[in-house]
Amino acid sequence: MEGTDQKKAAVGTREGLPCIAPLLTTVEETPQVVSAQVRGHFPKWLSGSLLRIGPGKFEFGKDKYNHWFDGMALLHQFKMEKGMVTYRSKFLQSDTYKTNSVHDRIVISEFGTLALPDPCKNVFERFMSKFELPAITDNTSVNYVRYKGDYYVSTETNFMNKVDIETLEKTEKVDWSKFIAVNGATAHPHYDPDGTAYNMGNSYGLHGSCYNVIRVPPEKVDLGETLHGAQVICSIASTERMKPSYYHSFGMTRNYIIFIEQPLKMNLWKMITSRIRGMAFSDGISWEPQYNTRFHVVDKNTGQLLPGMYYSKPFVTFHQINAFEDQGCVVLDLCCQDDGRSLEAYRLQNLRKAGAGLDQVYNSVGRSFPRRFVLPLHVSLNDPEGENLSPLSYSSASAVKQANGKIWCSYENLHPEDLEEEGGVEFPQINYGQFSGKKYRFFYGCGFRHLVGDSLIKLDVVNKTLMIWREDGFYPSEPVFVPAPGASEEDGGVILSVVITPDQNENNFLLVLDAKNFEELGRAEVPVRMPYGFHGTFVTV
C-alpha cells in the first residue's frame, strides 16, 4: 500500500482554480436574527442549532493578519425548528478583540502575525518592549467544546471562552493553567458516554516538554464551576526536550488514549525568542521528516503509558477519524498527509492569490487521505521478529516486531482511487454519539480540489466506496452528522454543512443531506456574507 505514496503526491494537480479571496475576507457580523429562505425541506424532527466558528476579521486599522488562523473569531448559529431556519453571527468579545479594537491596531500576536510595538512609544521603549513576555491571545477561533454541560470556544492556548449558545455572547474566560499544570489544550476533546471529557495539552518546564492526558469530570459539584476537578492522568516526555511535536487532535477508544508524536516540530527556543527576533510563533514550527512518527498508548483507567513502542514512516495528521479495540489491538483511523508543510500554504497572501499563482500554491500542498493503523497491545519478548503481529483478517495494516523491540506499523488505505480525484479528504466526522470508540463503517468529510473544501464526501471504510455532493462555485464546511430520533442504523440521520460562495450575486446556505443516500433534502439560504470557517457542533433543543 505504501508504495503508491509517490503516485498520490502527484495526483490531483489542478489548473485554472477560481479565486476564493472573498471567502477569506473580513465580513460584518449579523447579530440580529435573519430568517432563511428554505428550498426543499428540513425534517420536522431536526430541532436545535448548528454552531460554527472560524476567523471573520483579518485586520485592525492599517495592521493586517498574515495567516488564516489569525483572524478574529466569528460565532455562527443556524437554528432549526419545525422546518424553519434562522441565522445570526457575532464576533467573540475576547480580550484580544476588544484590545485590538480600542487601539485600532494588532496589539496581541497570533499564530502567524507578530504584533508590532506601540507606535506612540519612543525608540528606546519600542526596543525594550521586545524583551517583554508577549500576551497570550484568547482569540479562541477553532472549535466549540463541552465541559460539564457548558459550551466553550477553544483554540490551542491555555484560554477558552465560555459562551451562551443561545445569544452567542461570551460569559466567562477560563484559563486551563489555573486548574492543572498545562500551557494549553487541543480544541478536539473526546467524551465518554457519561460526559467525562478527555483532552491533551503540553507543559513546558526546566526538564523539557511533556504531552499530558487530561480528564475533566462530567458534572459540576457547585453551580459556578468550570474546569474544577480536571486532572492530568498521564504525562509523556517528548522525544526531543526542546522540540516537542505539534498536534491538533488525538485518538480515543473505550479504554485507551492514543497520542501521535509526529515530526511536525515546535522549536521552543524559536518560539520563546520570537519577539526578540521579530518573527511570529509560526516560524518555530518545522516539518522534519528525518524522524519517524511514533504512537503512544495510554490506559484511561490507570493512567499508565503502555510499554509498546510503535513507529511508522513520517506523516502528519490534524484530524483523527475514529479508533476502536478489536482482538487485543487498537485500530486507529486518521486523515494523513505525507508532507507536513501545509501550514505555510495557508498564509492569507497565498489563499487570496488568483490564476497561476493560486494553482501553484494548491499543487504544492500535500493531500490528506484516510489510513488505518493497527497497534497490537500485548507484545511479549517471545513474539517473533519480522512477522505481522496483527490478527485482524479484515485489515491489511501490519505491525511488525523489529530486532530492537520496536513495532513498525504500516497502514492500510481506507479509500478507493476515486478519492484521489477529489483531492483527498479532511474535516472527518462520524456518528459520534453511537460509534465513537467502536467499530464503525462510515465517515463524512470535505473533498479538497481547492485550498478549502469544495465537496462533501461519505466514505464507506468497509467496502471502500464513496458518495459525493458538489455544486460548482460553492464551498461546503465540515459536515456534521445528526442522528434521526430512534435510528438504529449508523447512517440513519442527516448531514448539515454551511455552503458558501465567493460570488456576491449568490446566497450562502445551510445544506441538509440524507446521510444514507447523500441526496439533498433542502437548503436554507441567507443573504449574508460568510468567511470559510473551521469547526462546529449541533446542539439539540
Swiss-Prot record:
Its cofactor is Fe(2+). Keywords: Dioxygenase, Iron, Lipid metabolism, Metal-binding, Mitochondrion, Monooxygenase, Oxidoreductase. Pfam families: RPE65. GO terms for molecular function: 9,10 (9', 10')-carotenoid-cleaving dioxygenase activity; beta,beta-carotene-9',10'-cleaving oxygenase activity; beta-carotene 15,15'-dioxygenase activity; metal ion binding; monooxygenase activity. Widely expressed. Detected in heart, spleen, lung, intestine, colon, stomach, kidney, bladder, and prostate. Highly expressed in liver and testis (at protein level). Broad specificity mitochondrial dioxygenase that mediates the asymmetric oxidative cleavage of carotenoids. Cleaves carotenes (pure hydrocarbon carotenoids) such as all-trans-beta-carotene and lycopene as well as xanthophylls (oxygenated carotenoids) such as zeaxanthin, lutein and beta-cryptoxanthin at both the 9,10 and the 9',10' carbon-carbon double bond. Through its function in carotenoids metabolism regulates oxidative stress and the production of important signaling molecules. PANTHER family: BETA-CAROTENE DIOXYGENASE, CAROTENOID-CLEAVING DIOXYGENASE, MITOCHONDRIAL. This is Carotenoid-cleaving dioxygenase, mitochondrial. It comes from Mustela putorius furo. The lineage of its organism: Eukaryota, Metazoa, Chordata, Craniata, Vertebrata.
